[in-house]
């Protein structure tokens, strides 16, 4: 039985094979650096080439998507699907439409998805997919034609018991509808082949809210562990999409004052905080008008900071909900200097490794994305369960299940992240070890394949 000699040897081996994939290597380094002490104490997990198998996707494929724009011109985009690990259930993970999409980013997201899905305790493997197509500025007809062209190839590789995609950045309700509709036409099946669907064709209540709500439920549990709560806390949120919107909504309901939101162009600062009226306006600008946060700032006469991120604002709690690596070391240092108490990730790996290390060293409570933002995929799992039973659960039922799952994730993080001599729970270690153990045990039980 082969056994990995050391962490450095393992990371070097991965880098030699995938050295051109920095985002993926960052994710691998983050996970295995945090769980290595556990692996040294439990050598069975370093045998049977388990670690080498875990960092290699079961399959990954790239394909061309040719479609026609409104001017009759043929456009060509590149699309991918990374089916990373199915040890505990069908592949599950979103589809992202953004010009930055490449294999490295999707491998990093798919790798993270393995552990995130395992943490939910639901039977879902890890996957991720997407395209460098940018839906911004495209007509509905163009988006539909692109989605149908993409699904004409992807449908061969997905299915209710094989791989169930969902939305992600650039893939909202409109795109999911077009993708799921064409998948149904091609496969002649109405099973749950996509999650995040509209309520009129198999979707689940609370699914749009799930990631943002789940983030707040997890952060609330982190605070409760310290005898604290959101009441009266000043909160900074980055992003202004689905996750950010519903995180703001839930934080307001718990008595917090949320003072920022952002997009790729800059951020808005409101010292008085969001109100129900202001949040409704943000929903309208982003979801209906597909506008920018600058439009929101102008509507309410708020400060807008072009080209900047909201981490310079003095707050108690910071919730990065935009994109990967948006919170860098300098941002973390500024947050620490300003007295931040808690950082929880609503986006996938939005905090760099260096920033994470600085926050942990300063005893800031830190909730990693694979735990803190697992509410979205957890509710996708609940959508799959409802579809298989041909049932609709009420919003209260789904929300209660989501809340329970997030509390269970927190409990598992506490179980594996309580380290002798450390005052705070190390949620990075806890989340990574808890997710790893579930997947690793399943892989060992199923033999080498």
UniProtKB/Swiss-Prot annotation:
Any GO MF annotation of the entry: glutamate dehydrogenase (NADP+) activity
* Keyword NADP part of the UniProt annotation: yes
What EC number(s) does the entry state? Answer: 1.4.1.4
Give the first-level EC class, as a single word: oxidoreductase
Q: Which GO terms describe its cellular component?
A: cytoplasm; cytosol
InterPro entries xref list: Aminoacid_DH-like_N_sf, Glu/Leu/Phe/Val/Trp_DH, Glu/Leu/Phe/Val/Trp_DH_C, Glu/Leu/Phe/Val/Trp_DH_dimer, Glu/Leu/Phe/Val_DH_AS, Glu_DH, Glu_Leu_Phe_Val_DH, NAD(P)-bd_dom_sf
- What are the binding positions for NADP(+) in this chain? 211, 242
UniProt entry tagged with the keyword NAD = no
The protein's annotated catalytic reaction(s) are: L-glutamate + NADP(+) + H2O = 2-oxoglutarate + NH4(+) + NADPH + H(+)
Which positions does the site annotation Important for catalysis cover? 168
Location of the active site? 128
UniProt cross-references to SMART domains, sorted A to Z = ELFV_dehydrog (SM00839)
Tell me where on the tree of life, at the top rank, the source sits: Bacteria
CDD domains in alphabetical order: NAD_bind_2_Glu_DH
Query: Which keywords appear in this protein's UniProt record, sorted alphabetically?
Result: NADP, Oxidoreductase
Query: Binding of substrate: at which residues?
Result: 92, 113, 116, 167, 380
Biological process according to GO = glutamate biosynthetic process
The UniProt family comment states: Belongs to the Glu/Leu/Phe/Val dehydrogenases family.
Function comment? Catalyzes the reversible oxidative deamination of glutamate to alpha-ketoglutarate and ammonia.
Self-association or partners: how does it assemble? Answer: Homohexamer.
User: What's the protein called, per UniProt?
Assistant: NADP-specific glutamate dehydrogenase
- The gene name reads gdhA
């Amino acid at each position: 039985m082969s056994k990995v000699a050391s962490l450095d040897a393992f990371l070097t081996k991965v880098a030699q094979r995938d050295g051109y994939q920095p985002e993926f290597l960052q994710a691998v380094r983050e996970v295995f650096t945090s769980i290595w002490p556990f692996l040294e104490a439990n050598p069975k997990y370093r045998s049977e080439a388990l670690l080498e198998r875990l960092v290699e996707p079961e399959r990954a494929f790239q394909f061309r998507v040719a479609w026609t724009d409104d001017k009759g011109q043929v456009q060509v985009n590149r699309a991918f699907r990374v089916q990373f690990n199915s040890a505990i259930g069908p592949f599950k993970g979103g589809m992202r439409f953004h010009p930055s999409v490449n294999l490295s980013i999707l491998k990093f997201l798919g790798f993270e998805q393995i552990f995130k899905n395992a943490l939910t305790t639901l039977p879902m493997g890890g996957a991720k997919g997407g395209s460098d197509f940018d839906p911004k500025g495209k007509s509905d007809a163009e988006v539909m034609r692109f989605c149908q062209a993409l699904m004409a190839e992807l449908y061969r590789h997905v299915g209710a018991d094989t791989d169930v995609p969902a939305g992600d950045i650039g893939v909202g309700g409109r795109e999911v509808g077009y993708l799921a509709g064409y998948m149904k036409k091609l496969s002649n099946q109405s099973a749950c082949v996509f999650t995040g669907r509209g309520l009129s064709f198999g979707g689940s209540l609370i699914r749009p809210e799930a990631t943002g709500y789940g983030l707040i439920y997890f952060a609330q549990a982190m605070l409760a562990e310290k005898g604290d709560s959101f009441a009266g806390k000043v909160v900074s949120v980055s992003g202004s999409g689905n996750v950010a919107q519903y995180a703001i909504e839930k934080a307001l309901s718990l008595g917090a004052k949320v003072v920022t939101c952002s997009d790729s162009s800059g951020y808005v600062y409101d010292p008085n905080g969001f109100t129900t009226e202001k949040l409704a306006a943000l929903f309208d600008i982003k979801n209906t008008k597909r506008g920018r946060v600058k439009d929101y700032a102008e509507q309410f006469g708020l400060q807008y900071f072009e080209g900047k991120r909201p981490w310079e604002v003095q707050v108690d709690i910071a919730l990065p909900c935009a994109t990967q690596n948006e919170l860098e070391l300098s941002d973390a240092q500024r947050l620490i200097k300003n007295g931040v108490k808690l950082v929880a990730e609503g986006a996938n790996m939005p905090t760099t490794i260096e920033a994470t290390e600085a926050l942990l060293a300063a005893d800031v409570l830190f909730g990693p994305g694979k735990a803190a933002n697992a509410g979205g995929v957890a509710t996708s799992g609940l959508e799959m369960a409802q579809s298989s039973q041909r049932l609709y659960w009420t919003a209260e039922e789904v929300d209660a299940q989501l809340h329970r799952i997030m509390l269970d994730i927190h409990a598992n993080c506490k179980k594996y992240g309580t380290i002798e001599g450390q005052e705070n729970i190390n949620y990075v270690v806890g989340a990574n070890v808890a997710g790893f153990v579930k997947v690793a045990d399943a892989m060992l039980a199923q033999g080498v394949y």
